[in-house]
Amino acid sequence: GATTANSGYPRSELREMTAGGSQNASWSNTAGSHSMTIRQAITHVPDVKPHVVAGQIHDGSDDVVMIRLEGTRLFVEGSSNDLGELDPNYALGTPFTVQVIAQDGHIYVNYNGVPKVTYARAGSGFYFKAGCYTQSNPSRGDAPGAYGEVIVYGLHVSHT
């Protein structure tokens, strides 16, 4: 799959845009409320390093929070730290809904309607990403044809 400038891992993601898709979105969680709700299922992971990211808040330089699957453990990661578990025994192909809310200098993550993570992290230049960011490649021991797959059934982004 395709990689981007700052990563050696392949991805197929939607990036939040504005102005009918002609401008990159960029907002601060210290003003207003910003929400992304995704109904999705992770359906495939690489064999050797079975890691996939299925949703993110990103800023101008790096990820802020990621919805991440490692093996069967679905959790939230932020600044390379484990922020909280969503499902310790996620089964591939199981649909779930994750809501990421950024407001008042915090990021909140709900999983299937249940609050799971509160993360104190204020910032700007934020934007949402949804899709599949596979966290492996041949240098990690996976075959060149290894892949991750995420099916997005529904996606809603709002700003108030």
Description of each model-found segment:
Residues G1-R73:
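Secretory/extracellular carbohydrate-interaction modules
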Residues A2-P10, G60-M66, N81-L86, Q135-G145:
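Short, surface-exposed beta-strand/loop "edge" segments at domain boundaries and coil↔beta transitions
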Residues A31-S35, D47-K49, G55, A120-T160:
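Ligand-recognition surfaces built from glycine- and aromatic
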Residues I38, T94-Q103, I107-V109:
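Short tryptophan-centered beta-strand motifs in secreted/extracellular beta-sheet-rich domains
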Residues T72-F75, I107-Y108:
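Hydrophobic residues embedded in beta-strands of well-ordered beta-sheets
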Residues F75-T97:
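Short, aromatic/His-centered strand-loop micro-motif at the edge of beta-sheets
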Residues N110-V114:
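Short strand-turn-strand beta-turns centered on an Asx-Gly dipeptide
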